[in-house]
Structures are given as structure tokens and as C-alpha cells.
Amino acid sequence: MTQNLGISVPIMSPSPMFANAPPEKKGVKNFAIDFLMGGVSAAVSKTAAAPIERVKLLIQNQDEMIKAGRLSEPYKGIGDCFGRTIKDEGFGSLWRGNTANVIRYFPTQALNFAFKDYFKRMFNFKKDKDGYWKWFGGNLASGGAAGASSLFFVYSLDYARTRLANDAKASKGGGERQFNGLVDVYRKTLKSDGIAGLYRGFNISCVGIIVYRGLYFGLYDSLKPVLLTGTLQVCFFASFALGWLITNGAGLASYPIDTVRRRMMMTSGEAVKYKSSLDAFQQILKKEGAKSLFKGAGANILRAIAGAGVLSGYDQLQILFFGKKYGSGGA
């Protein structure tokens, strides 16, 4: 999940990627508003969903934890994972890794929202002029490009969040944790694996972020003007429900990719690593079966409430302060 990549909207000198983008009036002001509103909405929603997010990650990566001797037996489900985590580590441990997640998510989501509309202006398709499908495709492309543009610079924070969330007290080693905090994750990973350790799984993440964000933003902005008409335009629950359904669909479509990248993250610092994302995918399928690629998907559906809240909450804030009804990102 990257973010600043030389982006010039128009805060820095233009990069070639944005050279042909249509100019925008009051660009700095709109960019700042997008960044702030998207980031605040994201930070609040992720903190609220942190317990279910940690459970999702624990279930998703439990096979790597068992291999490393950091989990004695598999989780039987969401309830079992919640219960065992609270019993072994305390209630507050459900928020382990949330600080890194908020640090990562604030600029990631804020810039996703801001860049989505900027990329949409680059494609500049109009539904009435260019036709629905060209306009729809432009929305998908702008959503995917926004997500891809926010991948590189904060990827290491996502790695650190994943390692902290999956840092259950070791089943072999007197209940000791592997990491003492965010800085310790960086220190130990750099010592054992170098910079590459912080970016393990990055390539497959690029694919996943385009698939997920393309659907997440593109479908929402494309379907919202069609489905949320009349009084439904300002109905929080209608906007929330649409966002929840779209977040679930996008999440399930890209979930196997997410599993592979996180399983690769978990091998940094370990003696045995996957050779590539394809090797990881093949090994997981061969040794554990296809169902292993979807472990934690149930918790991910619950977690999607946070994603839906970001989208609908952002829209409602825009309506309240700016009288804007459409465009979950800026213009």
C-alpha cells in the first residue's frame, strides 16, 4: 500500500504518470480535504474492527505459525480463536498490531480516496456521452490505479502489522513473544533478511491490490448512482449496505491472493521460505488444499463492516460539510 510515489496532485512536481491528467481547480485544497476526511474515517473504522481483524489474521496464517512452533493446535473457528486469544494473552491483545495498522491505513486509505478521483479525471469518461460500460470500466481502472499507487511506501508497515498480529505467545518457548513491538519487527527482520524481508510478498500484493481496489472503488461509484436514487441518496444505512456487499465481494475475489502474500510475509526470519508467490500458491494447494486459501474468510466478512463504514461514512461527511452526494474521494 503505497502512497506518495512522487505524486503530484499538485503538491509536488508532476511525475510522468500524471502529466496528461486534466487540470483541476483548487487542487491543493481538494487534495487536503480528501486526505484528511478519508484518513480519519479509515483510522476510526480500523480501530473499531481491530479485534476481528486480528482473529482473521490468526486464522489465515495459523499453518505458518504451527510450522514455526508458535501455535500448538489449529483454531476451530472464529469463536475458538477469540476465546483462546483472550485466555492466553488478555483482552487487550485483540488490538495487537493496531498501531501499525492505523499508521499504515491512515495515509493508504486517504490517498486511495484522493487518487481515485484524480485517476477518474484522467480517464474522464461520461456515462451519457461515452456509454455505461466505458464509464464503468473507467471507474474500475481508476480504483485499481489508486490502490496500486498507494502500495509501495507503506508495505513494510503492513508487513509489521501482520507479524505483530500473528505474534501469539509461542507454544514452544515458555509463552514468549517473537517481537516486542513495531520497532522490534523492523530491527529483527532487517537483521535476518535485510530490506527484502520487509517486502516479501510485495509482487503478488500488487496484483491483489489492483483486483481488490478496482472492485472496491469502481463498483461502488458505478453502482451507487444507479441503486441509491431519490431518498436513498442520503440514507446512511442504504449506503452502508451497498458498501458492505461490495467490500465482501471484492474481499472474497482477492482473498486467495491475500492469503498467499501474508503466508509469504510470515516466512521472513524463518529458515524455510517460499521461492516465489507461485511456489507458495502451489505448495499451499498441494499440502493443505484449496480451502486453506480461504481460511479466515468468515472473519473477513465480519471485518468488511469496517470497510463499508469507511465508504458510507465518508459520503455522509461530504454531504454534511460540503453538500456532496457522490464520489467517495474528492471532486
Swiss-Prot record:
It comes from the Eukaryota. The matrix-open state (m-state) is inhibited by the membrane-permeable bongkrekic acid (BKA). The cytoplasmic-open state (c-state) is inhibited by the membrane-impermeable toxic inhibitor carboxyatractyloside (CATR). Its main location: mitochondrion. A motif (Nucleotide carrier signature motif) lies at residues 261-266. Residues 261-266 are annotated as: Important for transport activity. ADP binds at R104, K116, R261. Keywords: Antiport, Membrane, Mitochondrion, Mitochondrion inner membrane, Repeat, Transit peptide, Transmembrane, Transmembrane helix, Transport. Solcar repeats lie at residues 29-122, 134-226, 238-320. GO terms for biological process: mitochondrial ADP transmembrane transport; mitochondrial ATP transmembrane transport. GO terms for molecular function: ATP:ADP antiporter activity. It catalyses: ADP(in) + ATP(out) = ADP(out) + ATP(in). The chain crosses the membrane at residues 31-58, 99-123, 132-152, 202-223, 237-257, 297-317. Signal peptide: none annotated. ADP:ATP antiporter that mediates import of ADP into the mitochondrial matrix for ATP synthesis, and export of ATP out to fuel the cell. Cycles between the cytoplasmic-open state (c-state) and the matrix-open state (m-state): operates by the alternating access mechanism with a single substrate-binding site intermittently exposed to either the cytosolic (c-state) or matrix (m-state) side of the inner mitochondrial membrane. Belongs to the mitochondrial carrier (TC 2.A.29) family. Monomer. This is ADP,ATP carrier protein 1, mitochondrial. It comes from Triticum aestivum (Wheat).
